[in-house]
Regions:
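Conserved catalytic-core motifs of GNAT/GCN5-like acyltransferases
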Residues: 104, 117, 122-139
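Acetyl-CoA-dependent GNAT
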Residues: 3-4, 8-79, 86-96, 144-148, ...
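Conserved phosphate-binding and hydrolysis motifs of nucleotide-dependent enzymes
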Residues: 54, 80-82, 109, 120-121
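Structural motif
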Residues: 96, 114, 118-119
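Short amphipathic helical patch at the helix-1/turn junction of helix-turn-helix
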Residues: 72, 106-107
Length: 159
């Protein structure tokens, strides 16, 4: 993700997460750390004409990774794009020597929970009232020892 992606990402952000969307400033702050040696990794998915249809971000510090965000435009959900973005984050976490990768997902989003489970994430806790202002709980999930090896990821996906 580059600075010029922030506007189209914000369009998706507001569409997909109207109650608890990130601000422009939050994305600018995240991108400020997305450089060689930085603590962030962000990626966007685009169509052939350059339209942003998905994005994802990772924070990696001291061997721990955290999925900051992952989103796919509604019309592209169910196409494997979310899985591709997740695999990118898993591989990046492994490249950064993370021994675990954490994420939060809304408890009322079973589709996303199933995606994460297919790639080896396990539930480890609940954060009460995490998503505001709707006061929705977050399920905390963890993947131990993320891998850069495609076969490992494929084994998780098909196993």
């Amino acid at each position: 993700m580059r600075w010029w992606d922030i506007e189209p990402v914000m369009g998706l952000e507001l569409e997909l997460f109207p109650e608890d969307s990130w601000s422009h400033g939050m994305y600018w702050s995240e991108l400020a750390e997305a450089h060689p040696g930085g603590t962030r990794h962000y990626t966007v998915a685009t169509t052939g004409d350059g339209t942003v249809v998905g994005y994802a971000g990772l924070m990696a510090v001291a061997g721990e990774g955290d999925v900051q965000t992952i989103a796919v435009a509604g019309r592209h959900q169910g196409t494997g794009l979310g899985a591709a973005l997740l695999v990118d984050l898993i591989r990046e976490a492994a490249r950064r020597d993370c021994t675990e990768l954490l994420l939060e997902v809304r408890v009322d989003n079973p589709r996303a929970q199933r995606l994460y489970e297919r790639y080896g994430f396990q539930p480890v806790g609940i954060r009460r009232g995490y998503y505001q202002p709707a006061n929705v709980d977050a399920l905390v999930m963890r993947l131990d020892h993320p891998s850069t090896e495609p076969k490992d990821i494929e084994d998780l996906h098909h196993g």
